[in-house]
Amino acid sequence: MSISSDPIPTTSAVDVIEKIVYDFVKPLGFRRFRRTLHRFVEGDISQVIHFQNGCPQKGIPGLLWVNLGIRVPECQEKTFTPSLPLKKYYQEYQCNIRTTLSFCTEGKDVPYRLWKSPQKIAADIICKLEQSVLPVFDILNSRDAILKYREDYPRFDQMNHLVLLEAAMIWGRRGDFPEACGLFRRYYAQVMEERKSASENGRKIYLEKGQSLSYLNERTGKTETVLAEKSGYYTIFHSPQAHLEYLKQLASQLNIPLENL
């Protein structure tokens, strides 16, 4: 069956699905803002369920993604003094802990097809939320819990390489600068080591058939071009410098010394 490009049926279907799901989570403190269901815990930590109708950037209509997120202000803003006042709600893309419902439950990206029964889709979403999402929301409902248990839920946290950095932000907001400084420096040293390993041993990148990539080989000092004869992973000996430079700037803003690393 072809996917309809008519936006009206899919929009109506998502309206039905969202209303059914919202009626289920509303007693738990969630409030609806457009396609976002949002609640605050511990005063300013956001927990978010977002309904994404299609993927316009890729020209994919007729599919529904359910995106999930948790936003800790200092982690998302990368500062010890987050901005005030709080907004009424925050979007999933503004969260620092993010995943999708399908990745959380199945470990892969499986959107819903909106030409199926909206009521059945909503029932499936509620079942998965009840079994796999709301219990995690209830555990990761405070800064203490996030520091202690975040790494227990890797499927819930597709940005989990930032755990140390964001723990530093939490400790910094609490006023424990030595702990924040130590965690930040550990993360910075980890990134430097990963960059060194990528330069010496290579790192994998995915290219579609026919794609090409020109880069500076850090082992030879020469520019090389990789042409993908088939879709798959290719090894390059180069590690981007941008994230390391960003961390240097952030350390300067936070008055964290990076000497002797």
List where the protein language model places each region.
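Intrinsically disordered, low-complexity regulatory regions enriched in serine/threonine/proline
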Residues: 2-13, 39-261
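Amphipathic alpha-helical segments
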Residues: 10-32
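A short acidic/basic microdomain associated with nuclease active sites
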Residues: 29-43
